[in-house]
Curated annotation (Swiss-Prot):
Gene3D superfamilies: 2.20.28.290, 3.10.20.590, HUPs, Isoleucyl-tRNA Synthetase, Domain 1. Coiled coil: none annotated. This is Leucine--tRNA ligase. CDD domains: Anticodon_Ia_Leu_BEm, LeuRS_core. A motif ('KMSKS' region) lies at residues 629-633. Pfam families: Anticodon_1, tRNA-synt_1, tRNA-synt_1_2, tRNA-synt_1g. It comes from Azotobacter vinelandii (strain DJ / ATCC BAA-1303).
Length: 870
């Protein structure tokens, strides 16, 4: 054992043994407990960032701990390799996205290996490879034939200069992010997954996931958005509309129908189009609405605008004529593209009515509260504690009573019906992009949309294309799209859209169970052996889309007979962000020039808070921007590779696990990394001194001195605490703190005789075992140096010896009138009377009770004695 701790050599040696022995490659072992631990796979952006390191270290610690519990552990890794960044990099560097992607994968894989992750690399999947996406295409064709996937027109952001569709985040202030052109709204045919058919099951089965954070389940419930309400039908006012017809709206508040004073429709609604034909101002407003955002999030914050159409509809209960407005906050793709407006009891309608001078009719009142039509108050929208007013025959009713009575009357006249609705919309997966999975459909003039037959799959994406940012490259490649119709044999055209990259990440976890399986999407036997995933780890930012789509895909695969479980992920851990200090100078144009923390010298106060900072290069001050998520834009990232090169992977892993509980943000600290490195050097020093003196014989537990019993008790307290913290609560930081406490005890422990040294041996073995999941390389070396057989990765997690925790004597504190005045040693089995007598006889206690009358003595068993005297 080398005298100095040398992480580079130690880590290389451990990793080469794991590689040679294929230590982390797993096979199905029927009868052996399985544990499938999965961290969300990365996008191969070029290099790992600290968020990746944290995510994969957490996963690895859990996987290694479960292996020590005797389970057959699967921890795979792969690459979410399709997507826009590859196209952008390709345009910038004039290189094919495939080449850029594969080079990034090679580098990032070497980085992951240097972290010492216990990954089964034989199961690696890369989503841009045809042997992966062919099964996605196969499922697409099956679902298309069943009607679970369908084609319809969808509204997209169209860049007229680049001739391409933009994602919402690529539209900046109404203009294309690359071309700067004014973006248009366009209707184009797109493919959709009918996820709404699974809405009820996706909602209900959240209740079968106790191992998921409540916050994530709430976010999904809200996204699915089940609501109870009614469809309400307003007849057209024929005189103003010019024809007979009906306007349908869905409302969760039919109880407020008596307060409806207008209706609003989307720009694309037939009533809007009809009115605009003879009204240039309205036509211009409709064009403006169509150019606006289609994102629901933007709807909430943007200014609400509307224009009267001059048309009216008839109130189904009162017969009143209600004006029809076109409004920019009504989305055509949602419900019927129309809403009824009750300004008195809906804040958005209230603002709109006040802006355009529309009537506000109060139909609910609260006792002791005044209603004002000029100022919104939160209680106007309440359901509880209010009573209907000014509602004719519906007066004096509660929410439920009014709801039931009004819906019953609507149903009786054919003007409405109860309805349960979901906020969730079908998932549009068509992307007018190149670097994605080709959609396996052939368009034939005679036969329509024809799925590519199974024997012709995969539809391979050509990999030698360099996109230029204009239009779809595939649509310019006759060699790709020209084909024969599989049904009639006539010339036909292949679909040139590719799939949303969320599709690949919706089923990768299942492919890991049988990545080389050529007989189907997954091998059902292997899928049922490993799935569901026991522990999934990833960022909270994926709470809705990725996790919802993966749950949806799991149910699709189940219904195809590919697997039998209902949910993909049994337990979910959402790790917090990695944050760091930010520093900047304000530029003349008002912008900010950000400096990396490594280039800044800081001054701290007594509590280590940064109070001043200057740039190392010029010695001049910089502004302190506070702690923010590590990012390129704020230039506050720390390169994991530089840290691994400087300190070793174990130090980085230890710091990551010690600095914060996994679900909270972790603040980067150079001092913290230095501290982690110091601690590992201490462990190494103690082990080196111990091993250098020769390995001891077996500990004789029957003849331990009291001092030795205390040391052994500290060892087994550490085992008990760490087992709870790591195994039950994922509180790795407190488990490490417990090992540090044990190290303090072991460093002070005597090594005078064979018993002392045998006890130190047990202590060091325990430190190695408890740290093995967190710092696997140094523990690999320690285990060998301590003379243990086999590898520590194959050792069992230590068990608590309950007899070691039993204390013969207890130390109790003694208080006089609540103030600490002494300590006493008493036998563990001492009676209350014996404890009281020992406390009264304590020399210091006698001094503080002299001349006082003792009124009572309170004994808290195992803790303290309090003497009350005056």
């Amino acid at each position: 054992m080398h005298e100095q701790y040398q992480p580079r050599e130690i880590e290389a040696a451990a990793q080469s043994i794991w590689d040679a022995q294929k230590s982390f490659e797993v096979r199905e072992q029927p009868g052996k407990d399985t544990f499938y631990c999965l961290s969300m796979f990365p996008y191969p952006s070029g290099k790992l960032h600290m968020g990746h390191v944290r995510n994969y270290t957490i996963g690895d610690v859990i996987a290694r701990y479960q292996r020590m519990q005797g389970r057959n552990v699967l921890q795979p890794m792969g690459w979410d390799a399709f997507g826009m960044p590859a196209e952008n990099a390709a345009m910038k560097n004039r290189v094919a996205p495939a080449k850029w992607t594969y080079e990034n994968i090679a580098y990032m894989k070497s980085q992951l290996k240097s972290l010492g992750l216990g990954i089964d690399w034989s199961r690696e999947v890369t989503t841009c490879k045809p042997d992966y996406y062919r099964w996605e295409q196969w499922l697409f064709t099956r679902l298309f034939e069943k009607g679970v996937i369908y084609r319809k027109n969808g509204t997209v952001n169209w860049d007229p200069v680049d001739q391409t569709v933009l994602a919402n985040e690529q539209v900046i202030d109404g203009r294309g992010w690359r071309s700067g052109a004014l973006v248009e709204k366009r209707e184009i045919p797109m493919y959709y997954f009918r996820i709404t058919a699974y809405a009820e099951e996706l909602l209900q089965s959240l209740d079968s996931l106790p191992g998921w954070p409540e916050q994530v389940k709430t976010m999904q419930r809200n996204w699915i958005g089940k609501s109870y309400g009614a469809d309400i039908v307003f007849d057209y006012d024929q005189a103003s509309v010019g024809e007979a017809g009906q306007l349908r709206v869905y409302s969760t508040r039919p109880d407020t129908l008596m307060g409806a004073t207008y209706v609003a429709v989307a720009a694309e609604h037939p009533l809007a189009q009809r009115a605009a034909a003879n009204d240039p101002a309205l036509a211009a407003f409709i064009a403006e609405c169509k150019a606006g955002s289609v994102a629901e999030a933007d709807m909430a914050t943007m200014e609400k605008k509307g224009l009267a159409t001059g048309q009216f509809v008839v109130h189904p209960l009162t017969g009143d004529r209600l004006p029809v407005f076109v409004a920019n906050y009504v989305l055509w793709g949602y419900g019927e593209g129309a809403v009824m407006a009750v300004p008195a009891h809906d804040e958005r309608d209230f603002e709109f009515a006040n802006k355009y001078g529309l009537p506000i009719r109060q139909v609910y009142a609260a006792e002791g509260r005044d209603f004002s039509a000029s100022e919104w108050q939160a209680w106007y929208a309440d359901k509880e504690g209010l009573t209907t007013v000014d509602s004719g025959k519906y007066d004096g009713k509660s929410f439920t009573e009014a709801f039931d009575a009004i819906v019953a009357d609507l149903e009786a006249t054919g003007h409405g019906a109860r309805k349960t609705q979901f906020r969730l919309r079908d998932w549009g997966i068509s992307r007018q992009r190149y670097w994605g999975c080709p959609i396996p459909i052939i368009h034939c003039e005679a036969c329509g949309d024809v799925p590519v037959p199974e024997e012709q799959l995969p539809v391979v994406l050509p990999e030698d294309v360099v996109p230029d940012g204009t239009g779809s490259p595939l649509a310019k490649m006759p060699e790709f799209y020209e084909c024969a119709c599989p049904k009639c044999g006539k010339p036909a055209k292949r679909e040139t859209d590719t799939m949303d990259t969320f599709v690949e990440s919706s089923w990768y976890y299942a492919r890991y169970a049988s990545p080389q399986y050529a007989g189907g999407m997954v091998d059902p036997q292997a899928a049922d052996h490993w799935l569901p995933v026991d522990q999934y780890i990833g960022g909270i930012e994926h709470a809705i889309l990725h996790l919802l789509y993966a749950r949806f895909f799991h149910k699709l695969m189940r219904d195809e007979g590919l697997l039998s479980s209902d949910e993909p992920f049994e337990n979910l851990l959402t790790q917090g962000m990695v944050v760091a200090e930010t520093y900047y100078r304000t530029l003349e144009n008002g912008g900010k020039d950000w400096f990396n923390p490594a280039d800044v010298e800081v001054e701290r106060d007594a509590r280590a808070k940064v109070i001043g900072a200057r740039l190392k290069s010029d010695g001049l001050p910089v502004e302190i921007g506070g702690t923010e998520k590590m990012s390129k834009s704020k230039n506050n990232g720390v390169d994991p590779q530089a840290m691994i090169d400087a300190y070793g992977a174990d130090t980085c892993r230890l710091f990551m696990m010690f600095a914060a509980p996994p679900e909270l943000s972790l603040e980067w600290s150079d001092a913290g990394v230095e501290g982690a490195s110091r601690f590992l050097r201490r462990v190494w020093r103690l082990a080196h001194a111990h091993v250098g003196a020769g390995l001891p014989g077996t500990l004789d537990k029957a003849r331990l001195s009291d001092a030795q019993k205390e040391i052994r008790r500290a060892i087994h307290l550490a085992i008990r605490q760490a087992s709870q913290d790591v195994g039950q609560h994922h509180k790795f930081n407190t488990a490490i703190a417990q090992v540090m406490t044990l190290m303090n005890v072991l460093e002070k422990a005597p090594a005078a005789d064979e018993q002392d040294r045998a006890l130190l041996q047990e202590g060091l073995e325990t430190v190695a075992l408890l740290l093995a999941p967190i710092t696997p390389h140094i523990c690999h070396a320690l285990w060998e140096a301590l003379g243990k057989d086999g590898l520590i990765i194959d050792a069992a997690w230590p068990t608590v010896d309950e007899t070691a925790l039993v204390q013969d004597t207890l130390t109790l504190v003694v208080q006089v009138n609540g103030k600490l005045r002494g300590e006493i040693q008493v036998p563990a089995a001492a009676s209350r009377e014996e404890i009281e007598a020992a406390a009264r006889a304590n020399e210091n206690v006698l001094r503080f009770t002299e001349g006082l009358a003792i009124r009572k003595v309170i004994v808290v068993p195992g803790k303290l004695v309090n003497i009350v005297a005056n």
